[in-house]
Amino acid sequence: MRLRVVAVGRPRLAYARLGVEEYARRMRRYAPLDLVFVRKGEELLPKAEGHRKVVLDERGRLLTTEELYRRLLAWEGERVAFLVGGAEGHPEAVREEADLLLSLSPLTLQHELALLVLMEQLYRVLTLRAGHPYHRP
């Protein structure tokens, strides 16, 4: 599985930037990862061309870690892009192209925090896939 995370704007908050960098470093031990930052939401889709598209959206489906793991296993061998919008959310065109609209929480999350939570969950899923004991249900 090849993962790409495309986010609007680089994290400016120190905790988010450091956390995203740390989880990206950890994830690359388990799967190829591209971490791409764009300036505007309209730039997300071109960066996800040829990938399954998982769009983070507060109106999306809430999945457990295990459900996300199973979904990604079903896409094994494919390229999967996770699209994280900026403060304004996603343009409608991005939501319409989604293979999966995913909500990380019923709460509204600041976009840098949402990116960090996504990175931790992707790391968790990759360790599950590898049989690593990081995830303890």
Curated annotation (Swiss-Prot):
Record keywords: Cytoplasm, Methyltransferase, rRNA processing, S-adenosyl-L-methionine, Transferase
> What subcellular compartments does it reside in?
Cytoplasm
**GO molecular function terms attached to this record:** rRNA (pseudouridine-N3-)-methyltransferase activity
UniProt cross-references to SUPFAM superfamilies, sorted A to Z: alpha/beta knot (SSF75217)
Q: Which domain of life is it from?
A: Bacteria
Q: What is its EC number?
A: 2.1.1.177
Q: Does the keyword Repeat apply?
A: no
Binding positions for S-adenosyl-L-methionine per the UniProt entry:
L56, G85, L104, S105, P106, L107, T108, L109
CDD domains linked to this entry: RlmH-like
Q: Which family does it belong to?
A: Belongs to the RNA methyltransferase RlmH family.
Which function does this protein serve?
Answer: Specifically methylates the pseudouridine at position 1915 (m3Psi1915) in 23S rRNA.
Recorded hits in PANTHER family, A to Z, give: METHYLTRANSFERASE (PTHR33603), RIBOSOMAL RNA LARGE SUBUNIT METHYLTRANSFERASE H (PTHR33603:SF1)
What does the record note on quaternary structure? Homodimer.
What is the protein's name according to its record? Ribosomal RNA large subunit methyltransferase H
